[in-house]
């Protein structure tokens, strides 16, 4: 109890700039939806809209590539996040929290620290609205449930039939493994183990290290359970086959199946919500 009070107080001190009030302030280019489960869905790279008056980022002097300077959108992840929220509600009777960037990544990148996320100050409000919502929702989940799961949804083309896990090799799910042991991170009843059972091809399948390009970025590193937010956070990199329009609903159904089972095992025990 003392640790939880300390974490809450510290989160206000460290993340007060993200506005930890009851409701995120609305922004036309950030879709937010309050949930009734200890589950948060994030999709920072699926948007296709311009930020008015903002030029495309150039990335001068920045290294390019996965985890570095990128302007391509993760096609289909906006639609996947919304479909997944619907599928979770259908299975569990309640909706998860949802934060989706509708602005295109070439104007601002919500999965980078602010100093690397945008070049035009006029893009800052959209970026901050995204993180305000995530910070507030993490705080709400921590307050109401004491534990939670943040799934940060991305797309990749390195392996079109695979979903890559990104937790900084377990760092962003520190509390999960402390509570339930390493099998909760890499065993058959881990989230990715449950994804595999649901019919998805995943990597890593066991205790192997995560693929170097997809180990988890700014969002999971900012809100993961190794931080004051105390929410287990997993970056999910979906191959193209999972994100094409005709497959999004099927993908959402499979992922929702894994989410429901994971929640029963690790999130909702002895809870009255």
What is each model feature region?
Residues 3-7:
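N-terminal export leaders
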Residues 10-25:
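Bacterial Sec-dependent signal peptides at the C-terminal "C-region" and cleavage site
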Residues 23-272:
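N-terminal catalytic or cofactor-binding beta/alpha core of small enzyme domains
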């Amino acid at each position: 109890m003392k640790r939880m009070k300390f974490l809450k107080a510290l989160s206000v001190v460290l993340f007060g700039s993200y506005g930890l009030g009851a409701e995120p302030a609305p922004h036309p280019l950030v879709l937010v939806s309050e949930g009734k489960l200890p589950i948060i869905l994030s999709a920072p790279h699926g948007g296709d809209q311009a930020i008015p008056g903002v030029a495309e980022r150039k990335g001068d002097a920045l290294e390019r590539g996965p985890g570095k300077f990128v302007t391509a959108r993760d096609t289909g992840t906006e639609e996947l996040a919304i479909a997944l929220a619907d599928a979770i509600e259908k299975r569990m009777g309640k909706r998860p929290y949802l934060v989706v960037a509708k602005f295109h990544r070439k104007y601002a990148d919500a999965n980078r620290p602010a100093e690397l996320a945008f070049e035009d100050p006029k893009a800052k409000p959209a970026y901050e609205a995204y993180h305000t919502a995530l910070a507030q929702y993490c705080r709400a989940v921590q307050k109401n449930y004491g534990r939670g799961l943040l799934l940060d949804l991305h797309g990749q083309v390195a392996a079109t039939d695979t979903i890559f896990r990104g937790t900084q090799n377990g760092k962003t799910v520190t509390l999960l493994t402390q509570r339930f042991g390493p099998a909760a991170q890499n065993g058959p009843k881990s989230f990715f183990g449950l994804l595999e059972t649901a019919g998805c091809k995943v990597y890593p399948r066991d205790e192997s290290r995560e693929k170097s390009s997809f180990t988890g970025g700014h969002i999971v590193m900012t809100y993961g359970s190794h931080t004051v937010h105390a929410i287990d956070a997993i970056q999910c990199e979906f191959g193209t086959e999972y994100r094409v329009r005709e497959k999004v609903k099927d993908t959402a159904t499979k992922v929702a199946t894994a989410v429901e089972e994971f929640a029963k095992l690790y999130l909702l025990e002895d809870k009255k919500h």
